[in-house]
Amino acid sequence: LLSINCGELVFKTSDSELEVFLSKQIGRDDAVSFAVDKDNKNESELILKRGSFNMNLRQGEYSLLVTDKKGRNITIPILINAGETSEIDFEFPTHIPDNCIYIHKGYYYSNISHHAAHGRHSYTDSYFLLDRELTIGEYLEFFKTVKEEKLRQLYNPDLLFHIDGKFQLRKLFGDDYKILPPYNENMPVVGISVEGANAFCRYMSEKIGMKCRLPYFVELEKAARGTGRRLYVWGNRFKSDYALLAGNAAVKEYPNGAPPKTFPHDYSLFGAYDLTGNVRELVQLNRNLDYYVLYGG
């Protein structure tokens, strides 16, 4: 039987050697991140389990750190509601692409805002996501493979440059692939077209041998929000210095975007950076509609 303030966690896996560290999420508005720190037990009150298990927990937000025998880690945020059972059916993916996080299938609360605190229960399948924004240098590697001039014009990002006291629309890459200043290869790429973004995904699909695409809106929202009802990746209180936003004095230092992972507080429960600030992300609205929206930033 569950007490009035408790719910049940059921974790199922066929791998009895998996180590699962369970931690209550603490300091939800002030911690740098909410990832489980198994080397700092004083802050996390860790519970270690192996393989499948079930247990009763007080209602609240928790994190699971799942570690396989290769030493790979996956973080799974969970929300325990009083009187309810949260079931996780988990198998470790055989391969995790470089610089990617794995986001486990399941429900999360979408469309949370100051005016809609409860949100809607939305579901996603499991997926991989780049753990930070794509850089200009990475996009340039793809762009150098494009030979047709018409496509080169379409895929070359259009950006506004302040030249001789006027704003002028220019291409990011020159004829010799030179990146026009003030941009550089370490900054997040901006100004790309939908066609350019999808062409880059096709290029990456061939490069890594896995299908790549732009994320759906719900996938990026889940990666940012976790499974609870937080307003921001770090919690519910807005803090302008936690991310590169208009109210942050760091905008003077990074007027055109900062290198990914510059702001450690802008780090989600799943392990993705810059989903609140820095540049915006281009996402598909959903799998059934050929519409695209800009998210975050």
Write out the residue ranges for each language-model feature.
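Long, contiguous interaction/targeting segments characteristic
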Residues: 1-3
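Active-site/binding-pocket entry motifs
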Residues: 17, 107-110, 114-115, 135, ...
